[in-house]
């Protein structure tokens, strides 16, 4: 099944996405976040129905892009499963 994602709203450093039936959002704690396109692509790549993601900028690379830490939490199972992915 293919899921389409759209940026629904942007308020400060919080962005919300519509992915199929569920609202999903990520919050960047970086003061200057200029990688919204890359974050959206990563979000689409790792997020499926029943999963929520939370992304946090944990540093900056040599080119000034944020180094992101993703929390992927499964919400439709009996146990929540959480993993972290460095992008």
Give the location of each predicted region.
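Conserved aromatic
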Residues: 33-36
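Short, mixed-charge low-complexity intrinsically disordered segments
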Residues: 40-87
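Short aromatic-glycine-(Arg/Gly/Cys) micro-motifs in beta-strand/loop hairpins
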Residues: 1-29
């Amino acid at each position: 099944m293919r899921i389409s994602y759209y940026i629904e709203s942007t308020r400060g450093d919080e962005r919300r996405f519509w992915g199929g039936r569920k609202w999903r959002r990520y919050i960047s704690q970086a003061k200057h976040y200029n990688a919204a396109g890359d974050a959206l692509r990563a979000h689409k790549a790792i997020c499926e129905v029943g999963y929520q993601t939370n992304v946090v900028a944990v540093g900056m690379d040599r080119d000034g892009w944020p180094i992101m830490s993703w929390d992927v939490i499964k919400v439709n199972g009996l146990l929540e499963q959480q993993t972290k992915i460095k992008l």
